[in-house]
Amino acid sequence: MSKAATVDYDYARTWAEHDPDPDTARQVMTWIEEGNTDELAAAFAGPLAFGTAGLRAAVGAGESRMNRAVVIRTTYGLISWLKQHVDTPVVAIGCDARHGSAQFQRDAAQVISAAGGKALVLPAQNPTPLTAFTVRSLKADAGIMVTASHNPPADNGYKVYLGGRIATGPAEGVQLVSPADAEIATAIAAAPHADEVPLSTDNIVDVDTRAEYLDRAAQLVGAHTDVTIALTAMHGVGAALGEKLLTRCGFRVSLVPEQAQPDPDFPTVSFPNPEEPGALDLGIRHAEEIGADILIAYDPDADRCAAAVPTSSGTWRQLTGDETGALLGDYLARQGATGNFANSLVSSRLLGRIAAHYGLGHEETLTGFKWIARTPDLAFGYEEAIGFCPDPTAVRDKDGVATSVVLASLAAECKAAGTTLLERLEGIYATVGALYTQPLTFRVDDLSIIAQAMDKVASTPPAELAGSPVAKVEKFAQGSKFFTDNNDRVIVRPSGTEPKLKCYLESPDADRLDAIAADLRAYFGI
């Protein structure tokens, strides 16, 4: 059966007739009139899956895209589920600067208001961590953040936190997990047509928690001077809050001018993710021009944070997520952190060693901050994909803005001592033992290739890697781990969001990583 043959024209027409947005309704009707089965099949490939990351898709017409109809029905399902648990649910709502974000925020607020909830609406174009902070600080029962984080420009999304009377203890203010996600998805499926969902402005309250957020984040460090920071928001929403925080703490801040203002088209980068090759080129150029001590880069919704530093040879080097995680963990431990450190299982084992060195607890969790943030008595958590949580009491999620001030403080400490962040990292290796990491990713067009690769891993794992026998194989819900006699570790798992097979390589000998990668390429044959 062809893709075109699966189009239900009556369903698409009914959707368009009940779409509250005349533009997307008109688009669907145009496709119907033209007989454009390819576009219709893509737009009606099934409802957007409401998972633990909420929703994320391209902005456009139809049930499979991000649009007003989808946001309205999703919010109806969410508030219906919340009302099963509490009376008059209180929901904080934030949004970034992507296409459609402000409208989606207004729609969500009006649905919550009409359903008997109370909507706390944050100023538009602000970081995701501000919404997460607001859920905890104002004891909201839930939080909605309209964002697609570092996705391509065409996308938007809808992220949900639970708190207040719904989630308490370590889970307060954290992204939802199963079974709540499935229960909310069921409620969304039962929602009426979008234009039949009541809207109201009666119970909408504008709230602004930026001052409280800045007060809290500023307490993470003391006042510093004599450190110059090049800061880029990657065309996202982090510049204003980040610059205020860093300046307040005494740092000299210079924004990368081409990337300072929010722009949903992200014109200077091919992909708005600080991890991507070339994404920091403008930032590094600016850092060199102003003689910066460090370059700090937020991703578009500022929940993640990358750093680059000058080397002894005069070039600049971007720190990996694992390197930054080790530096932050060591710094926070030396500043008197108590409780537990945590990182995802695909992140380096180095944080566990650092925690043990300072007498702190350590937990290894499944991938995703929804699991890291649930660690009891959490003092610091991170994932290798440049996500860091330096103040979990305030923000139980990744927080690029708060992370940036801790990184800046660490840079100031190093400068005052006549050393560098890279030298500090070597000092950590000397104290607890070196571990170096490297990613290896296989992108495929056919998802069956990934399934075959994972079957091979389960049935016949590699006998050796870079000449060292594989001594142990451990399976976990998302994949497998290999350990060699040399204490190398390889983790293999499918990507949860893209058609990729992801491998995470770690070794006490950096020179072995390329050889391990070569052996894995030969092993998988992809």
What are these regions (language model features)?
Residues 102-107, 132-136, 154-162, 196-197, ...:
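Short acidic, glycine/serine/threonine-rich loops at helix termini
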